[in-house]
């Protein structure tokens, strides 16, 4: 297995939730702690939390969404990145491990069909250059936009339940009840 750095995207404003999503509790631990544990169990050599607070790596390009967090993380390590959002608490190692083990040397981005996150991203000059260009132009600041410009591969999704985002209090209540 390749050496990789785990990245947790936790820099969003959580405006629809009304509070910091990374601190929400699910099955006895915070969303942030759950993500860290998953990345460690998947084999991450290091973990970067992309967040604009004391505990995280700040964005170099502020107010540009998750691409800015990914860009900041790429500057912190020479390893490829396994990137996950803080607000997908149903993810397990079963979804993350194939992203690490199925990568080909020519693949720059590996993700699940229909879901741009979690994402395995090569840390190459080409990837950093393309990402910087997107951020400088501030045109189509989506992860899908980045992926479309890279050599990428999609894995099939067997159960989309694991990829559910928690964006609102209703979303949170629905996963806590399950």
Predicted regions located by residue number:
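Alpha-helical elements of Rossmann-like donor-binding domains used by nucleotide-donor carbohydrate transfer enzymes
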Residues: 34, 69-72, 98, 102, ...
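The conserved acidic donor/metal-binding loop of glycosyltransferases
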Residues: 85-89
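Short, glycine-/small-residue-rich phosphate/pyrophosphate-handling segment
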Residues: 118-147
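Conserved alpha/beta core of the MobA/IspD/sugar-nucleotide pyrophosphorylase nucleotidyltransferase superfamily
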Residues: 2, 138-178
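Short phosphate-binding loop-to-helix
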Residues: 52-83
